[in-house]
């Protein structure tokens, strides 16, 4: 967050040429890539990182930072603490990698974590487990409207007394990289 905020105040743009793969032959060559993300450095253990797609790791990292910054941890009853974290599409990179394994190497090579890693609701579920948030847990999936929809639903849940606090947001995972 400090790096991001510092870049904002210095007028540094976060969008640049794609560096994660060769864009030759692609019309789109620009993206807002997250640089140097290390799940362990933000508190996600290695085993968890191996079982979660990058979009869910981004969600967990953001939730951990938001909860730490808010000072709310331990101050809300677990049954009144919710998680509304959506995803426009889920773990696209995992989907691409595991589909390629299936087609090129056969079904026995597909990870048993394929579905749990890629489905969009896993980010919300993992965050709820991590913070013992036993209140409402809603993974909103409404394409490009997911961010606004998620925040609106979280607001509504608090307004109508379904929860006292809700972690709300939407992670954006990396683009699906072609297999080299």
Please identify what each model-predicted range represents.
Residues 175-179:
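Substrate-binding strand-loop-helix patch
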Residues 1-89, 94-135, 156-159, 169-170, ...:
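Conserved "HGTGT" condensation-loop signature of ketosynthase/thiolase-family condensing enzymes
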Residues 136-142:
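Short loop-beta-helix segment that forms the pyridoxal 5′-phosphate
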Residues 139, 167-168:
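Structured core elements
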Residues 147:
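Short conserved active-site loop signatures built around small residues
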Residues 150:
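Active-site histidine-anchored catalytic micro-motif
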Residues 162-166:
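Short, high-confidence coil segments that cap the C-terminus of an alpha-helix
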């Amino acid at each position: 967050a400090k790096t991001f905020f510092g870049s904002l105040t210095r007028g540094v743009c976060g969008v640049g040429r794609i560096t994660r793969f060769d864009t030759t032959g692609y019309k789109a060559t620009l993206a807002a890539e997250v640089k140097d993300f290390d799940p362990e450095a933000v508190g996600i253990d290695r085993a968890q990182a191996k079982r979660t797609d990058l979009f869910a790791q981004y969600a967990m990292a953001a939730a951990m930072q938001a909860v730490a910054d808010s000072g709310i941890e331990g101050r809300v009853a677990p049954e009144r603490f919710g998680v509304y974290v959506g995803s426009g599409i889920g773990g696209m990179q995992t989907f691409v990698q595991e589909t390629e394994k299936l087609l090129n190497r056969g079904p026995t090579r597909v990870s048993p974590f394929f579905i749990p890693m890629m489905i969009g609701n896993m980010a919300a579920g993992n965050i709820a487990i991590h913070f013992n948030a036993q209140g409402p847990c809603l993974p909103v999936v409404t394409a490009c409207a997911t961010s606004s929809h998620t925040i609106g639903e979280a607001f509504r849940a608090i307004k109508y007394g379904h929860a006292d606090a809700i972690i709300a947001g939407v992670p954006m995972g990396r683009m699906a990289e072609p297999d080299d």
